[in-house]
Amino acid sequence: KLVEINISEKEVIVDPREAQKKNQLIFPPRTFFLGDTESAWKKCAHVFKGQAHSNGQEHLYIETQGAYAVPLENGHIRISSSTQGPTAVQRTAAKVLNVGMHKIEVDVVRIGGGFGGKEDQATPWAIMAALGTQILNKPVKVILSRLDDMRMTGKRHPYSSDYKIGFSKELKIMAYETIFYQNAGAAADLSPAVMERTLFHGTNSYFIPNVKMTAYSCKTNLPPNTAFRGFGGPQGMF
């Protein structure tokens, strides 16, 4: 009764193509190119166009996200976290708790399976535990249930792509263009790095003399997607 909440419904965007049309981007688009695709199309005997779509993927690590924070002397805090990036936990905890990094100790006894899902995504739960410890001066543990973990954490990035590919009479690839629409979710997380890896892997194992690839990291109303084995490479090669 002491808190009054006013909620206004806003448009929900979950399709990266729709987000791109409305300029809802995590950061500016990137384009990689080689040769001259515009000139190459005229020399191609066969040209194909189409779309490709790849969905997200749950990490399903053996143990869910979790952290345990304990108060030490002189305002120091020790965080036991299932993170793949202990320095990120230390740096973020110091910023949120407004203390020096030297006052935050991060231990990683075991991860319990990660596959990329406990890089940046492990940090919020560790910070919640640390903040509770700072306020209460008592040990605090935060462990997600499997259902909450699957609902609240990011997955492999879904992609939607437009492609155009041209072949010579001998069926050698002469030119290739593609536009990637990455579904980043609501915040950046590792989406910029994942997107650039997609561009680096866009031609798979082939040498194509004329290439142009553009990628958009699209902001949608979903949990921020994150690293997963391959880190954007599989989406680019697909």
Question: Where are the regions a protein language model picked out?
Answer:
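Structural alpha/beta core scaffold segments of enzyme domains
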Residues: K1-F238
